[in-house]
A protein has these predicted regions:
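Class I Rossmann-like S-adenosyl-L-methionine
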Residues: 1-170
Length: 170
């Protein structure tokens, strides 16, 4: 990750652009189980890795972050073209998703949608425990920071990237 970060010279991006990239990446990871389920609803084939990554990111932006549909589709298709991926397939899937995006916002993964290694580790959970786990797993986390001294607090205020009016990345 560090090598890719340096290779693409992301340090040259301004604070707003870095915050945007972090926001999309973090939310794409947060909503991965949701976007997998959504993608499965709209395609019979299993896209290759790069196509899946582009689609997961685009679905997150369209359905959960409420970015402009046309902007997300256009930029995703352009990246797909540069990577020589099936841009027509990506375009078609994203256009279908845009039509249904309001109802897709309520798509929620089931316990069985979690990774196999996790299902094996939790096979002894009771049905109500699994239901509670899923209900709580996808809630937006609270973050409580404790600073040891005033200098750390001041450093924090100076070295963060706002992602919204309520949150930021360090």
């Amino acid at each position: 990750i560090d090598e890719a970060y340096l290779k693409n010279n992301l340090n040259s991006l301004n604070t707003k652009d870095r915050a945007f990239i972090n926001n999309v990446c973090m939310n794409s990871m947060r909503y991965l189980f949701h976007t997998k389920k959504i993608l499965f609803l709209y395609t019979n084939k299993n896209p290759k890795l790069h196509e899946r990554i582009l689609l997961y990111s685009a679905i997150t932006q369209i359905v959960f972050l409420n970015f402009k549909d046309y902007a997300v589709i256009d930029s995703t298709v352009e990246v797909a073209k540069k990577l020589k991926k099936f841009h027509g397939f990506i375009n078609a899937v994203l256009k279908k998703i845009c039509v249904d995006k309001k109802k897709l916002n309520s798509v929620s993964p089931d316990f069985k949608d979690l990774p196999l290694w996790f299902l094996k580790q939790t096979k002894d959970l009771k049905k109500y425990e699994k239901k509670d786990f899923i209900k709580n797993f996808f809630l937006e986390p609270d973050l409580h920071l404790v600073f040891k001294n005033k200098k750390c607090l001041l450093d924090f205020k100076e070295n963060n990237y706002p992602t919204s009016t309520k949150s930021c990345f360090l």
